[in-house]
Amino acid sequence: MPKMKTHRASAKRFKRTANGGLKRHHAFTGHRFHGKTKKQRRHLRKAAMVSRSDIKRIKQMLAQMH
């Protein structure tokens, strides 16, 4: 059986945490900041955790990452 391959697009977007969770960046941070408040922009800068319902699927894509 061939080796499992890591989904490279996902590997660039997610980072594993020490406790087995996954960190991600927020969407809506590329442009058009004039329509967002300072508070919104500040919160969008911080990393977020992947929701529980998505973790299993993403971990399968990142199977070979340590």
UniProtKB/Swiss-Prot annotation:
For whether the record's keyword set contains Ribonucleoprotein, the answer is: yes
A cellular component term from Gene Ontology for this protein is: cytosolic large ribosomal subunit
**Keyword tags:** Ribonucleoprotein, Ribosomal protein
Would the keyword Transcription be found if you checked this record's keyword annotation? no
Please, one GO biological process term?
translation
Region listing for Disordered, in residue ranges? 1-23
Q: Which Pfam families match?
A: Ribosomal_L35p
Q: Which InterPro entries match?
A: Ribosomal_bL35 (IPR001706), Ribosomal_bL35-like (IPR021137), Ribosomal_bL35_CS (IPR018265), Ribosomal_bL35_sf (IPR037229)
Q: Which residues form the signal peptide?
A: none
| Similarity comment: family membership | Belongs to the bacterial ribosomal protein bL35 family.
GO molecular function list: structural constituent of ribosome
NCBIfam families the UniProt entry points to: rpmI_bact (TIGR00001)
In terms of superkingdom, the source organism counts as: Bacteria
Q: What is this protein called?
A: Large ribosomal subunit protein bL35
